[in-house]
């Protein structure tokens, strides 16, 4: 009997755990994740903010309890792995050492936070997990102007959903067109014009230099000038 520990509980972690347990039912398979949710729909986060997804519970594909009942995999949420010793095959979880026979790292990516002044102010958010979407939705109830930094899928969807709430949104991106890895310049220009027709302000070829505010955000400083903002969404990668 083998003990397999998986660090990370979203798509890759849960899929790997379920497959390992299915192929080797007698093995002990354990997931540790620092999030409180597992197996959530990241693409749905902006639509929870906009109200199309009504409850944050709808974002969670599987609860830990459901996943364990379904697969036999043990799941520990809000448990952060802080050290790994491959020599003696142990990890440190919340200060305790846990042994393993095989270890799978499925930690995903952390949101990129630009190295600029003011990103820790109230009203500045990244978008990665359901808890982020809940914070953004709550904060947006009192916002009138938002800046979204980053014109990828999540950035565009966040801009769309904030506009649905009646918020005036400016989207900035350092690229000279929207989504250069996906669209050619002609298609990107068509999309930009359509978004502008809907009321989105799009500022391209622009870098975020600083977030301005006293305790909470009031504007952003960019290479194109200062833009007023009650809230800022960082979706730069």
What does each model-found stretch correspond to?
Residues 12, 37, 83, 111-112, ...:
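Surface-exposed, flexible loop/turn segments at secondary-structure boundaries
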Residues 135-183, 217:
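Rossmann-like NAD(P)H-binding beta-loop-alpha module
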Residues 26-30, 70, 75-92, 98, ...:
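A Rossmann-like FAD-binding core segment of flavoenzymes
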Residues 16-17, 41, 86, 114-116, ...:
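Short glycine-/acidic-enriched loop or helix-start segments at secondary-structure transitions
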Residues 2-5, 60-147, 219-236:
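FAD-binding core/adjacent interface of flavoenzyme oxidoreductases
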Residues 13, 42, 46, 64, ...:
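A general structural signal for well-ordered alpha-helical segments in protein cores
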Residues 8-11, 128-129, 150-152:
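Glycine-rich Rossmann-fold phosphate-binding loop(s) that bind the pyrophosphate
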Residues 2-74, 161-183:
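Beta1-alpha1 glycine-rich phosphate/pyrophosphate-binding loop at the start
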């Amino acid at each position: 009997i083998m003990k397999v520990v998986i660090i990370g509980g979203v798509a890759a972690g849960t899929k790997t755990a379920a497959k390992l347990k299915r192929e080797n039912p007698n093995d002990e398979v354990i997931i540790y994740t620092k999030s409180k949710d597992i197996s959530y729909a990241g693409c749905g986060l902006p639509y929870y903010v906009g109200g199309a997804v009504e409850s944050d519970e709808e974002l969670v594909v599987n609860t830990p309890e459901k996943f364990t009942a379904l697969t036999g995999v043990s799941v520990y949420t809000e448990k952060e792995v802080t050290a790994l010793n491959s020599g003696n095959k142990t990890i440190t979880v919340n200060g305790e050492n846990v042994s393993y026979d095989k270890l799978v790292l499925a930690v995903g990516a952390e949101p990129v936070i630009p190295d600029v002044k003011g990103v820790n102010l109230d009203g500045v958010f990244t978008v990665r997990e359901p808890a982020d979407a809940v914070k953004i939705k709550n904060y947006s109830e009192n916002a009138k102007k938002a800046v979204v930094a980053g014109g990828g899928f999540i950035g565009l969807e966040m801009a769309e959903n904030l506009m649905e709430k009646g918020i005036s949104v400016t989207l900035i991106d350092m690229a000279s067109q929207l989504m250069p890895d996906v669209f050619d310049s002609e298609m990107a220009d068509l999309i930009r014009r359509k978004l502008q027709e809907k009321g989105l302000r799009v500022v391209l070829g622009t870098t975020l230099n600083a977030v301005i505010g006293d305790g909470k955000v009031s504007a952003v400083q960019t290479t194109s000038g200062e833009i007023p903002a009650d809230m800022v969404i960082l979706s730069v990668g």
